Amino acid sequence: LDFQFWIHNLQIPESVDLLVIGYGSTLRCDDSVGLRVADTIEAMNLPGVHTLTCNLLTPELAETISQASRVVFVDAAVDAEGEIQLRELVPAKSSQIFAHAAEPGTLLAMARDLYGRAPRAWCLAIPVDNLQIGEELSEKAQRGLTLAVEIIRKLAE
């Protein structure tokens, strides 16, 4: 497999109220659910909403995050108890990253520390079953995708 880091749609328009960041791997079945949610939202062309997809959360996202009024991070959650979870985030105390990928709270701290602003943000965790190599979504992930799109649509109103 030829694995490369990528971010799609990094530049955002000036008037973005809601930034939706879907992340995960297209190679691992349900792990792609965050990406698919963002792609579905993008196709809806909701006013004031911009989507961004990436395989990992990295420091390059901090500037883009600082430019949005609100941000929703969308990801697969293996340990979720069967229910989709929307939880409000706060910036981490430190903006330092000690691994190859960042957590949403760390990116919010980086946006605050480097660009002077951390927007209101949430993590939307979608319960999943299957992280094997492949492209199919499980029924559980598909149900979560549908519900996640509805939650984001309501946030965008």
Feature-to-residue mapping (PLM):
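N-terminal catalytic or cofactor-binding beta/alpha core of small enzyme domains
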Residues: 6, 10-128, 135-147, 151-157
